[in-house]
Amino acid sequence: MNIPDPQLVIALDFDTQESCLELVDQLDPTLCRLKIGKELFTSCGPKIVEKIQWKGFDVFLDLKFHDIPNTVAKAVKAAAELGVWMVNVHASGGEKMMLAAREALEGYQVKPLLIAVTVLTSMSDEDLKALGITVTAAEQVQRLAALAKQAQMDGVVCSAQEVVQLKASLGEEFKMITPGIRPSFAGNDDQTRIMTPEQALKAGSDYLVVGRPVTQADDPLRALEQIAAEMARASLGS
């Protein structure tokens, strides 16, 4: 099965290079891209990005930059220098911060997708209320996603439950990256707003993020292939 633009992103939630690369060597770059988050990047540094790219995988650098505009702009530029496929910032950092990130990429012929994080999938309405945010998670996602589009982001990270409304209000070209995806053979773990791969694609998600159902599987490649099969069912409309 050869997918030139894989919609599946596997989260590499490891703390050592050895354990990470052991898993990566079992995966297929025609079926997925790979996400490097804070734990792995802090433990291993930029070299882990290069090692994974050498193995043929596109990299989503998931560091969720959130700082003053100048600092975020420099961080995004550094990510572009690494040649990553996707990088993200927190929409709650504001329009000026996101615009600075966009401007930092102007000199690059091949730019990473610049994505904004809205509301983390682990957050419930009650969690937001505890932070002083009185609207629901879905309403907060709508607010932040609209701000992200205004600030020229390529898309947002959001729960699959919000995708239909976001696509309707922000347009089909605005990318939706959805964590909280659990294949039919896996449990819910610690994320509260979840969907299966088939459900998420039918809702309009552009890229799906999956972690433990693959990384902790007895046979990671088989798990990856099972998820790819679920995704194929969505494209067939069955």
UniProtKB/Swiss-Prot annotation:
The keyword Lyase applies. It holds the Pfam family OMPdecase. Substrate binds at residues 13, 35, 62-71, 121, 182, 191, 211-212. Its EC number is 4.1.1.23. GO terms for molecular function: orotidine-5'-phosphate decarboxylase activity. PROSITE patterns: OMPDECASE. The active site is at residue 64. Keywords: Decarboxylase, Lyase, Pyrimidine biosynthesis. SUPFAM superfamilies: Ribulose-phoshate binding barrel. It catalyses: orotidine 5'-phosphate + H(+) = UMP + CO2. Pathway: Pyrimidine metabolism; UMP biosynthesis via de novo pathway; UMP from orotate: step 2/2. It comes from the Bacteria. InterPro entries: Aldolase_TIM, OMPdecase, OMPdecase_AS, OMPdecase_bac, OMPdeCOase_dom, RibuloseP-bd_barrel. GO terms for cellular component: cytosol. Homodimer. Belongs to the OMP decarboxylase family. Type 1 subfamily. Catalyzes the decarboxylation of orotidine 5'-monophosphate (OMP) to uridine 5'-monophosphate (UMP). PANTHER family: OROTIDINE 5'-PHOSPHATE DECARBOXYLASE. This is Orotidine 5'-phosphate decarboxylase.
